Curated annotation (Swiss-Prot):
CDD domains given in the database record: RPS2 (cd01425)
Keywords attached to this entry: Ribonucleoprotein, Ribosomal protein
PROSITE patterns, per database record: RIBOSOMAL_S2_1
GO molecular function ontology, one term from the record: structural constituent of ribosome
Keyword Ribosomal protein attributed: yes
TM helices/strands, residue ranges: none
Organism: Nitrosomonas eutropha (strain DSM 101675 / C91 / Nm57)
Family, similarity comment: Belongs to the universal ribosomal protein uS2 family.
Top-level taxonomic group: Bacteria
Protein name in UniProt: Small ribosomal subunit protein uS2
Ribonucleoprotein in keyword set: yes
Annotated InterPro entries: Ribosomal_uS2, Ribosomal_uS2_bac/mit/plastid, Ribosomal_uS2_CS, Ribosomal_uS2_flav_dom_sf
GO cellular component terms, A-Z: cytosolic small ribosomal subunit
Length: 251
């Protein structure tokens, strides 16, 4: 998917926050103001958004992992839906402190979640008494809500895609500590520092959030398909070379 200016306008990407809440570090990306609302310069956003998508494509082509993060109400369902569509891990409920910096401990909780899911599948849950089964179900739901999106993640992600960097401050701090690159949607009231790939734009509109997440998921799928295509082309070339050698031998 190639993002266009028209798509961004229709999604309201250009609508920033009230001027009194602005962060001066976002000044280079602001076009002006209308009715005390800052207007994002979409010419800058278009270039930076496309750069971020190119980066995601390259990572995906190299089989690297991008973690989707969006825990605010407007982003939760969209982040989950698009991450699942492209096979990426995601966090769409509460960000647990240490989710990156203390990943070893988080892995233990993920193991517990996976063991509990096996118990459901093999019928062990049915053997529990009513109260135990109820407690089990509650724990399973809680673990699934916080860790379900990363249960297949074998290690730390290679990069992160974050909706609303202000809302996810803890996430950004952890990523920066570990040197994990961040692609982040940054509205006019937030600080772009610590974000390697800034996407200046509206982080509140569900339409805008869907545009960002869908484009990122598409870029990941395109990158993976590109890698598969390259393998196929190499296979074809090898076959042609071998075929040519066989013909030479026959001659």
């Amino acid at each position: 998917m190639s993002v266009t200016m028209r798509q961004m306008l229709e999604a309201g990407v250009h609508f920033g926050h009230q001027t009194r809440f602005w962060n001066p570090k976002m000044a280079p990306y602001i076009f002006g103001q209308r009715n005390k609302i800052h207007i994002v310069n979409l010419e800058h956003t278009l270039v930076m958004f496309r750069d971020a998508l190119d980066y995601a494509r390259r990572l995906a082509a190299n089989k690297e992992t991008i973690l989707f993060v969006g825990t605010k109400r407007q982003a939760r369902d969209i982040v989950k839906e698009e991450a699942i569509r492209c096979g990426a891990p995601y966090v769409n409920q509460r960000w647990l402190g240490g989710m990156l910096t203390n990943f070893k401990t988080i892995r233990q909780s993920i193991k517990r979640l996976q063991d509990m899911e096996k118990m459901v599948q093999d019928g062990t849950l049915n053997k529990l008494v009513k109260k135990e089964a109820l407690d089990f179900q509650r724990e399973l739901e809680k673990l699934n809500a916080s860790l379900g999106g990363i249960k297949e993640m074998k290690g730390l992600p290679d990069a992160m895609f974050v909706i609303d960097v202000g809302y996810q401050k803890g996430t950004i701090i952890e990523a920066n500590k570990l040197g994990i690159p961040v692609v982040g949607v940054v509205d006019t009231n937030h600080n772009p520092a610590g974000i390697q790939y800034v996407i200046p734009g509206n982080d509140d509109s569900s339409q805008a959030i869907r545009l960002y997440a869908r484009a990122m998921a598409d870029a990941i799928l395109e990158g993976r398909n590109q890698a598969i295509q390259e393998i196929v082309e190499i296979g074809k070339t090898d076959s042609e070379v071998l075929s040519g050698q066989d013909l030479s031998a026959d001659a």
